[in-house]
């Protein structure tokens, strides 16, 4: 898939036309899935498909993020967690995302996040998500080993690198 071309076509879209955005992005999701299926049928090994799916999804989410969050007025980081955080994305797997906030979201951020998640669902991506501040990550990690493990395997997709680094530091095994 030609991601620079997709980004340009998305930027050229009428920002008020959800149908046009959904059509473009849904076609990209189908192209990615069909391409990976075809590679597998032609003898490509499973690991290449699983890691390739994650990398292609990373690129797609990055484009959607840059498109959807142009008017963002808060510091956030979009983070892959779970198997997706490890860079593994099996067919039909959920795409587990954590949206890390520097502070509680304001109404603008809340609206943008809602639009972002709705768009991901509308284009056929199965999204599992959480929205947390660093303090909430620390609290949840202390209470729930699955959250701690997810955060240990987390990787930054897009957004504020310093915020991500602070979260990783405060939720490291030495601090939990």
Residue ranges and their predicted role:
Residues 1-74, 92:
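N-terminal regions immediately upstream of nucleotidyltransferase
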Residues 77-112, 120-122:
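Catalytic metal-binding acidic patch
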Residues 171-176:
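Short, intrinsically disordered, charge-balanced linker/junction segments flanking boundaries
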């Amino acid at each position: 898939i030609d991601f620079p071309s997709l980004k340009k076509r998305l930027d050229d879209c009428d920002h008020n036309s959800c149908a046009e955005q959904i059509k473009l992005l849904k076609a990209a999701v189908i192209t990615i899935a069909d391409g990976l299926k075809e590679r597998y049928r032609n003898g490509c090994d499973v690991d290449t498909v699983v890691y390739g799916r994650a990398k292609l999804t990373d690129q797609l989410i990055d484009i959607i993020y840059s498109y959807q969050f142009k008017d963002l007025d808060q510091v956030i980081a979009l983070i892959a967690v779970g198997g997706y955080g490890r860079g593994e994305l099996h067919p039909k797997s959920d795409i587990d995302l954590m949206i890390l906030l520097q502070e509680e979201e304001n109404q603008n951020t809340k609206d943008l996040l809602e639009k972002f998640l709705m768009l991901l669902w509308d284009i056929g991506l199965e999204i599992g998500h959480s929205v947390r501040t660093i303090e909430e990550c620390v609290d949840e990690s202390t209470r729930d080993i699955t959250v701690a493990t997810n955060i240990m395997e987390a990787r930054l997709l897009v957004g504020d690198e310093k915020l991500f680094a602070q979260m990783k530091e405060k939720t490291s095994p030495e601090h939990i």
